Amino acid sequence: MAKTSPVVPPIKLSEPTESGNDTTETSGRLKHLFRDQPLIPIGCAATVGAFLFATRAIRRGDSMRANRFFRYRVLAQAATVLAIVGGVFMERKMKQEKRMEQITPK
């Protein structure tokens, strides 16, 4: 007599977002990120762009232009980090306000 293993239900790795979309797909995650924190992907793209232009300038031997683009990269990175920190604080503030609305009687 062969033993049968119990049937295990599948594990759901992520919960649907407020809009009902599943965030496991890349396009869903990107849409969610652009909607909630649009400055972060823009800052990342600016950082990568500045780095690529600096690399191109180095290959062409234009060190002054390369240094200028490296400075732009640093500024773009700083702006991205500030956007991340600001987003974290805003998210925390929104959660606290939502919690206070639930606690406070009307």
UniProtKB/Swiss-Prot annotation:
One of its GO terms (cellular component) is mitochondrial membrane. Residues 1-28 are annotated as: Disordered. Residues 9-102 form the HIG1 domain. It is found in: Mitochondrion membrane. It is a multi-pass membrane protein. It holds the Pfam family HIG_1_N. The keyword Transmembrane applies. The chain crosses the membrane at residues 39-58, 73-90. The keyword Heme does not apply. Keywords: Membrane, Mitochondrion, Transmembrane, Transmembrane helix. Its main location: mitochondrion. Residues 16-27 have a biased composition (Polar residues). Coiled coil: none annotated. Cytochrome c oxidase subunit which plays a role in assembly of respiratory supercomplexes. Associates with the respiratory chain complex III/complex IV supercomplex. Belongs to the RCF1 family. PANTHER family: HIG1 DOMAIN FAMILY MEMBER 1A, HYPOXIA-INDUCBILE GENE 1 HIG1 -RELATED. This is Respiratory supercomplex factor 1, mitochondrial. It comes from Schizosaccharomyces japonicus (strain yFS275 / FY16936) (Fission yeast).
